[in-house]
Amino acid sequence: MEDVTELVLKAQKGDEIAMENIVNMFRPKVSAISREYFLVGGGLDDIIQEGMIGLFKAVYGYKPDKNHSFSAFASLCIEHQIQT
């Protein structure tokens, strides 16, 4: 299996299979973060959708030359998207 950084770089260049693999890899993380923000009476699906938008933003905003992992960057982007 490819390294997540390699997948991100491919996705940034328009590789749909790479993006699909990233989404599948990070779906559990998006769901876990989304559940932290879920309130009774609210829509968990809506929160998860916002989290996925955050994941997409992370993919296109990630710069591997910075000294942080994609996973950490993605978590921040997911949380920020859900909070806004």
Range-by-range predicted roles:
Residues 1-84:
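Alpha-helical promoter-recognition and RNA polymerase-docking modules of transcription initiation factors
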